[in-house]
Structure formats: structure tokens, C-alpha cells
Amino acid sequence: MYFNNELSGLKDRFLKSLLAQKYPDRINFFLWELKFLDCFLHLQNFAFASECGMLDVSQKMLKNFKRMCATFRSIRPNAGSDNAFAYLKEVICKRLCATLLNTRPDACSDDGFAYWNEVIWKTKQEFRAKYSFPKTPLASNKVDDDDINIHSPKFVMEFIDAVVGNLNVLVKINDPCSLLFVPGPKEQIDQVSKELKLLRFFVCFVSNKCIEPQYGHTTFYIHALIEASHIAMVVWLHLPVYGNGNQDLAPSEVSRLLSDFISRNSNYIDVLKALKSTIPQAQNKHAAESGIVETPTHNLMVGLSDQMVNLQEMLCLLRDNLIHLPILDLEFHLQDMDSVILDAGLLIYSLYDIEGEKEDTVLDDMNRALGFDLPRNIEPIKVMVYLVMQKAFQCNLPRVHGLGYVDFLLKNLNDFQGRYSDSLAFLKNQLQVIQTEFESLQPFLKVVIEEPHNKLKTLNEDCATQIIRKAYEVEYVVDACINKVAPHWCLERWLLDIIEEITCIKAKIQEKNTVEDTMKTVITHTSSQLARTPRMNEEIVGFKDVIENLRNRLLNGTKGQDVISIHGMPGLGKTTLANRLYSDRSVVSHFDICAQCCVSQVYSYKELLLALLCDAVGDDSARRKHNENKLADKLRKTLLSRRYLILVDDVWDNSAWDDLRGCFPDANNRSRIILTTRHHEVAKYASVHSDPLHLRMFDEDESWKLLEKKVFGEKRCSSLLLKDVGLRIAKMCEQLPLSIVLVAGILSEMEKEVECWEQVANNLGTHIHNDSRAIVNQSYHVLPCHLKSCFLYFGAFLEDEVIDISRLIRLWISESFIKSSEGRRLEDIAEGYLENLIGRNLVMVTQRADSDGKVKACRLHDVLLDFCKERAAEENFLLWINRDQISTKAVYSHKQHAHLAFTEMDNLVEWSASCSLVGSVLFKNPDSYLYSPAFSISLILLNFKFLKVLDLERQVVIDFIPTELFYLRYLSASIEQNSIPSSISNLWNLETLILKGISAKTLLLPSTIWDMVKLRHLHIPKFSPENDEALLENSARLYDLETISTPYFSSVEHAELILRKTPNLRELICEVECLEYPPQYHVLNFPIRLEILKLYRSKAFKTIPFCISAPNLKYLKLSGFYLDSQYLSETADHLKHLEVLKLCDLEFGDHREWKVSNGMFPQLKILKLEYLSLMKWIVADDAFPNLEQLVLHGCQDLMEIPSCFMDILSLKYIEVDMSNKSVVKSAKNIEETQVEDNQNTNFKLVVIKKMMWKVDVGVNKGRLETFKRLAPLPGIKSVAFDFNKKKLTVTGDMDANEVQLVVSKLRKRGML
């Protein structure tokens, strides 16, 4: 309305005043009155307002305002203006609030509000007696064409909205002491409000149908305005006034209001009949407003309303699905849809014109009275309801699908029919037919994956997409049936149509002979698309001159700190080049400390500091509790007096550099910082001595070498003709490395034929103009359909985020992206998909496992990530909801099965009501802190009833587990409780459960967890299963469970029982209760398929109470135990296939000696020893025959590495860190023998300068400050204390003897 902004500002002024808390009810009452007055002032140009007295009311109240504000002489109407609106706004907003809340202008009273109350009351008494409903014929209420905006439908709807808003205030007030309280039932006011809303819908509907206003429509708008204004006046006059007694709204007035509405239904009917002759106008983005089909049943007779139940149900379904349905999806049905809606409106309003109805009115009598056949008229409505419901679901289905969705549906159909047999009984036959049809199509879907280069690839993928869409629809129909959100006739018809459509798809497949043979026999050969792409040496290609230039800057130049800034456009290889230098051995050996961080466009300052500190001094979980200032100070002190190399990657603006630069002190010791950025301004701003380096483009020779290496690996292109085409393609990439790599990914999947490469060259020729996105789009276009969804899913991750592969694969499986294949694990198939994307150069590997070369972590280039986000949004696949994005229900209310990524939980609350059919909710935030919303996040999540993936990354604390989401397959979050409810078993589809308790207490796992037979991955830090052995014995076995972390086993018997329940376990991380002195080692048989085992102690150093027996174990980590040679020898006898052994923080018995006999650990490839008390290590000549890597960290008591390592021909790498000089010397002797005598050119020795010594000094807390004096001494990096063990730990470059000398001096001085 005209006065809305002023009222809003006035309310803000009231709420900010000191009286807001004292008189909140007065403020609300005052604003309520002004809103009604505003309504009446807007009617001053209409004749009916003057005839019925509304205009007199507004003029009277305006005079009162003027008199109340008479003391403010400075307030005058603008010159030449007698506009009541302008004067009212000026007076009210500037002066009246002060008058009302403080003093009366013409009296000494201290209560201006009491005076205002009295004025209103007298005015209402004066006008109540003489007010009457306007009887003027509608025709006489015409206004001139010049005033068309005043009575436009927009004006009418805004007026109705204002009146409805004031009525809703009365309905909500239940406090008898409130000035706005209306005693007695509120049904009368509520019914008036509903009538007005219905009228408003009708006005909107008419306006949508008629772009050009006609005389009849304008008359109708005036009629609607008269009705609404009459309601406003009656309600205002009869409102109870504080201090004058509560007076209810007169029942007679309410009855008259409703009867007035009903008596004028003939006007609605006339307008609807006129609209039937018009052509539907599609001027709006969405289908027409359907509010007119909301049946106003309060005046329908009981007998009649009972007969209209079915009609009302259909109309509600029509309304609910039409409101936000994009009109483009119904463009061929607009005429039919308009006809149905108009007929429905005529049917409803005609019911009120039947006079003399009796309560025993029957359907036949009603049909005769109306002049038409009700059942026949309802049938078109049923057809339209079904069409609209179907379209509302189909129109925004994602256009990219996971081919594993049919597998998920087929499993669930069996479960649904077993769990909900009663609800699904009437659909049993149809569901059985559908199940059979989908099973018959499984071989075809397998062909689509295994033969992506089939000549009918496009047709195959189109058919596969249609099949998946039908699977989505079946799932929705089944759920709608179970939850009774749609009538049986509609769902039954829908399933019959799905069966018919599947039959058509099969016919199309057979007709084109795409699977003529495979529909009868199953293809058994392994696809090249599932095979792993051979890994090649990831050595950088090109930029040799640039590398040499930058290496010289890092090692030479000024003695002061210097920043080496590298800038250039996306895709040039700035990050690759910087990482190449950062990992260069000749560079790294020059610096004491090396650390790196990636900033990105959106970053967390705290996370950057933590990343740098982790590289500089090691990881420390307690450090996360510190604030940013403390972390920054810690980093600065760590780097002070040390020569450091820092890599700061992907800086977007100067402020990011300002945040970090203070942490890098300049000690004039040739410290260096490498900085990469896209922007020259940032590079120049950060520079100190060296000029920024603008990274050049590739030259033609470098372009071809990179393309050749990416396509052929270590081989060369032998065909001159092929090379000619390749050179042309490389040149077309315009010397941009990213473009070359992406095109190489396309070529590597093609036959090495000139014709194929020519086709790529021709396609690229029309797209490439310094536009990497065009090449990315080409790479995406040639992806097999089963890889497209996997690739676009990367758009759900943050910029520069390092993605854990285990987590990614679990998400892919939960999203049904992975198609099952008989005899193969889904995880193995998913790894093949990933390697395929890596082979196409769409995904960058950041970490591989040392033992088997499998990818452990990856990331996406910024250009590729942006493409994934944009393309995923276009395909209705993934939508990012950012902090400043406004919820638009009209656009996103039906994003069926899409994935939503949120950066703030508040966004989730705003969007939850309009995203009930979303399949995935992913929370992404660069900060790692726990987020505890003030609202019930779990209640919000219940709105997402089709949710299959809920990944809150254990960052968001949920108040309870939403166990009603039975489609859920992946759940990751933090919880407040110390126990998990037994209702967790209601999530019977759950495959991955990742929970973290916010307290340090052990989480209690209910026994019902053993009912979750689909569970594959269970990860809960420090949980304890209910120790009810009888209950566990009788529970089911979890045959699908493959990974568990981190249960607490209180006894060997407890562990045995759990292991029997998980026969197919592959990875186990657990804590065990240890024994002081076990009488003998009990052999604990772990599941035969177990490959990874990590054991941690639960308390202080004690012996493991069992000997490990796991015939196929490949990875073993033991941490925190008391061990001896006997235990390790007995364990080795049961671990013949062990490839990786990590012993961490162990105390050794037997005089701190470890003897390794011949034949022990025959398959071991990696041996890592960290912080052991080991002094003497004796290894037989034939032990560790296949060892490749030996890593020693913090083994400061070890005297030397056994000489037998010189003769292990498979040895490739030794790393020594924080150890004594004797260990370093023995490692160098081994290196010399391996390289010179054994000619092992692949051998590499890495000695890290940091050294650690532990000295027993009898430390007590009172001397803590004394020891801190050690830290600033030259050569000492840090000092740490362990009061329990009475040990001092000094980290630095000093010799151990020098440390002992310092300690001796401190003792002599009485400081120890």
C-alpha cells in the first residue's frame, strides 16, 4: 500500500525507543489502527467510499491528527498541495509517535496514548450507527480511464492483502490483556479472512487471463474492492478498544458479510463464463493461479459437502501442483487446463446459487439444479489432475543420471512390498510387471557402460536416460501411495502409463538392434571404460627456462626475505609449476622449514594457519582450539630465525595476502615465499625484491610435447601423419596447457587414427578462441553417460578442496552413480570410473597410496570446477545455495532428485519448505569448526522426505537423528547425545553412517544397529556396542558391512563376537582394552577378507591381549602398546600377505630390542617406525625380501639401521626424521651400497634436518618458565614437556651431546 514504507519505518522507530519494552502492545495497536486508516484513505477517489461514510471516517481521523500535532508549527503541507496522503505521512512519521508515547500536546497528561485511545473510540461510536453497506449499482462506480492504475488488479490485490494482514493479527492474539484481543471463538474472523483470500485469488486469476483490461473485468475489480473495503470498515468499527470493554465482532455483521459474498456469486459466474471464450494468455513464467479452485466449504450443506469430497481432493491436488509449475512444460495443454480450471470454478460457485436446498439433497437433484452432469464434468478434472501431477514431477528431473539407480529401485521394490504390503496391495500386479521389465533391461544398461563407443551411442544413452527417469517416477508413485498423498486412481493410472512407456523403450531398442544379442546373453568381457588408466610419470613438461629462473631466485638473490610471485590466466599451470619447485630436492634441502597453503577465492584464515603449522611443526589436534591470533603468533615464532620456504597458492586479492604476510618474519636469512595468483595487481602488491613473473604461454614445441606425453605416455607418436594432425590440434589450443591436457584426454580415448583426430580438430576449430570452457564442454560431451554424473558431482566441492577418495566413492555409490556388475565390488567399479576421469585429464591426483598406487586424494582445476557447477545447474543436477541467495519457490520448488549444496545452515532453513523432493543435501564450508544451529535442524531435515544423501561433514551438530528419512543411504553429521537411539534401524536403506559426538565420551551404539543389513560403512569415533552378549548372539550378521571405525573392545570375547557378526569386513580401526601381563597370547581370528587393521590402546602402555590372525591383511598399524619380539614374531606368522606395517609410539620389552627372523614379512613393501623406544634392531639377512620403503620418525634411541638393508634389491626409499647421527650415518652407508654397488638408480634417501631428543630431567611444573628459555637459543626450534613421563623434548639442529651439555649446565645452576 501507499503507506507501507512509512509504517515500516515508524515501527522501527518505536521498537528502538526506550518505551518499546514498556508498551509493546500499545505500539502494535497503534500500527494496526494506522494500517486500516491507510486503507480508507486509498478509497477517496471512489464514489462508494463517500456514499457509505468511509471518506468521512478518514477525514475525521486526519483532523484529529492535525489537532494532536498542532504544537509542531514547523510542519506544514507542501506548497500548493492539499494531498492528504503526503501530509499524513509527513506528520505521522516525524511527530506523531513522539506525541503518542510521551505527552498530549494540549494537556498536562503524561499519557498521550490514553488520549489517542479516547479519540479513536469516540470516532468509532460516531460512525458505527450511520455506516451502511454501499448499495450503489456497480456501474456507477466507474472511474475515468486516466485513473486505471487506481483500480487495477494489482491495486485491488494489494488492498485485499492489507486487510487480510490486519485480520490475521486478530486471529493470532490470544492474550486477554492485549488491546487486540477478541474474546470467544475466532472462527468468524478466520472465515472472513478465507473469503478475502479466495476473492484475491479470483482477481489474480482474471488478471492473468486478460492482459488487456475490458469493461466487464474492470467492473469486477471495483466490485471486489467494495467487498474488501466493506469488510475492513465493519471489522474496524467493531474492534474491542482498551479501556472501553471488550466487545466481540457482532455475529449479525459476520453473517451479513458472508451472505453478501454468496449473494454476489453470480458476478463470479458471469466473469468465468466470459473467460471461457478467451484464448489463454501465457504471459507469466508459471501456470495460472489456481486459487479459485480452493473449495469454500463452510457454507455448503453437510449432505452436499459429503458428496463433494472427491471433487475437493482433486481440486486441491490440481492447485498444489499447478502453483509453481513452469508454463512451458504445459504449453500444449494450456487450452485444456484453462477449460478445466474455469469449469471447476463454475461448478463451485454454481453450488451457491441453488436456492431452497435441503439437507437431503442428493447428487441427481443437484445435477438437475445445476443443469449439467456432475460426474461427467468431474472426469476432465481428473484427467487434468493426473496430467499436472505427472508434469510437475517430470518437468525438472535432472537430465544427467546415475545408471545405478535401477539397481537401487529393484532392491527397494522388494523391501517396500514386504514392509508396506497393505498400502501397496492395489498396485501389487503393476509393481510386479514393472520389476520384471526393469530386470529385463539390466543387460542393456550394462552394454551402455561397457560399449561407450558403440556406433549407436547416442541412441543407447537416450534410451538409458528414459529408463532412469521411469525409475524415478516409480519410486515417487510408490512413496505417494505409502504416504497417501495422491488418490489411488491417479497412481494406478500412472503405473499403467509407465509400463506402456517402458514397453515402447524396449521396442525402440529392439528396432534399432542396439542390444539384439545382449538381451539374450550377458556380455562377459571387461570394458576398457572400467579398466584402470595406466599411470605415467607426472613429470612437468615445458617451462624449463622458467623453472631454472625461479630456482635461481629461490636459492640465490637477496639475503632478506623475498616473495616470488607467479601470475597469469587460468590454465597456464601456475600451481603445477609452483608445486614442482616446492618439491624440488635441490630447493627443499636449502631450507629448514617448508610449508604450504592454498588460499582460493573463499578461504578460512584459521584453516590457512593450521595448514602452515601442520607442515612446519607437525599436526596437533589441540591446536584447533586456539584462536586465530594465537595460531598466527605461533607460526611467526616458529618461522623466526629459521630459513623457510612457504608456498601460498591461488591468492585472489590483496586482503588475503595482508592476512598472512605478518606471519612471515624477515630474519635476513634468505627465506622465500612462492605466491601464485591470477591477478597482476596482487602479484605486484606482494612482491618485495623480485619482480612478479608473468607466466608465459607454451610455445609450439612445448604444446606438442605435452599433448604427446598425455596421449602416448612414455612412448612416442610413430605416425608422421598422425603427428601432423596432432601438431595442428596443439596449435589450435593456443598454447594453453590446460586446453592441451583436456584435448589430450579426448584423444587418449580414441583410436590412434588420422580420421578420428581430424574429427576432433574440426570440432575444436569452431570453438577455441582463448576459451577453455569450450574445450571442457567438448571433453564433457564425449564422456560416456555413466561418467557424466560422476564428473558433475565434483561441482559440490569447494574451490581447491583436496577430496578424499574414500569419501567421494561412498557418495557416488549412495547417489546411485555406480552400476553394479556381477562379481565386482561397487567400490572397485567406482575406482575404475575415477581412473577414467583422471586418464581424460579432468581430475588431478594429489596423493596416491605408496603400496599399490591407488588414488587417495584428488582435486579439480578451478576452470573445471566452475564448469561443473554451471553445467550441473543447467542440467537440474546440482544447485549451490549461497549466503546471499534468496529462496525462490516459484523456480526451485520442484527440483526433483537434484542435489543441493549449502554454505550456511540458515540457507537450508529458508529453502527447506520448497525442496521437499531433493535427493541430496551437502553442507560445504571452508571453516572446520562445529556449527550448532539455534533451531532444530533435524526437524527442518524431515521436510526432505526423499533425501538419500545428507552430508554435513560432521561440521553441523544435529539435535537428533532424523530416523523418518527411510530413503537415506548416506548420513554424516555431529550429534549432541552420548548415545544413538534404537530407532536408527528405521533408516533401513542406510549404507554409510558417519557420526561424531561433540563430547569426549564414548558413544553408545544400540543393539538395533545389527538390524541394518544394508550398512556398508560405519564410522563413529570411539563408540561402544551394547555389551549384551545374548542379544548380539541372536542378532543378524551384517554381510555388507566392510569398514568400521572406531569401536572400543573391552575384552577379547567382545571383539570375537563383533567380528563374527561382520564376516566380510575389509577395514577395521579400533581401540582395545589391554592387559598388564597377559598369561599367553590368544589368537584372534579376524575376518578372512580384512585388508586394513589399525589398533590403538585405550589407556596407558599395555600389552595387546591377543595375537592377530588375518590371512589377507595388507595394512597393519599398531599404536600405543607395550610389545616385544615374541609378539611381533608370532603375529608375523599369521600375516603372510602384509604389505604395509606401521608401528607408532610403542614401548619395547626384551631390553628394547627387536629381532626379525628369516622369512618374516615376506610381502612387506612399506615399513614405518615412529616414536619407538627401540634401541637395538636385529634383522636376519632374508627378512623383508620385498621391502620398498623404510621410514624412521622420532626413533631417537635407535643406534643404527641394520646393514642387511644394503642387500635388499627391492628397496627404493629410506626416510630419516628426528633421529640420532648414528642412524643417519647408517642410512647413508646403505644409500652408498645401493647406488654404487647394487646399481639401484631408483634408490632415494631423505634426511630431514629436524632432530629430537628426550632427556630425563625430573621436570616439575614450577620450572616450566625456566625451560622456555631454551626455545630462543640458536639451533633449538621448540621445547616440550611431558610431566607424566618426566621427559624434556627438544627439537632442533643441535647435536644430542650439545643438548645434554645445556641440561648439565642448568642442573649445576640449580635450575633442574
From Swiss-Prot:
Membrane topology: Peripheral membrane protein
Gene Ontology CC: one annotated term: cytoplasm
Gene Ontology MF terms: ADP binding; ATP binding; metal ion binding
Domain HMA positions: 1248-1312
Chief localization: cytoplasm
Protein location: Cytoplasm; Membrane
Residues the entry annotates as binding ATP: 568-575
Positions of disulphide bridges: none
Keyword terms of this UniProt record: ATP-binding, Coiled coil, Cytoplasm, Hypersensitive response, Leucine-rich repeat, Membrane, Nucleotide-binding, Plant defense, Repeat
Coiled coil regions, renumbered to chain: 419-442, 535-556
Occurrences of domain NB-ARC (ranges): 521-823
Each LRR repeat, start to end: 944-968, 990-1012, 1087-1111, 1115-1134, 1135-1158, 1161-1183, 1184-1208, 1273-1296
Pfam families membership: LRR_14, NB-ARC, NB-LRR, WH_DRP
Biological process annotations from GO: plant-type hypersensitive response
Note: This protein is encoded by the haplotype B genome of the allohexaploid Solanum demissum.
Function: Confers resistance to late blight (Phytophthora infestans) races carrying the avirulence gene Avr1. Resistance proteins guard the plant against pathogens that contain an appropriate avirulence protein via an indirect interaction with this avirulence protein. That triggers a defense system including the hypersensitive response, which restricts the pathogen growth.
Family per record: Belongs to the disease resistance NB-LRR family.
PANTHER family associated with the record: AAA+ ATPASE DOMAIN-CONTAINING PROTEIN, DISEASE RESISTANCE PROTEIN RP
Protein name: Putative late blight resistance protein homolog R1B-17
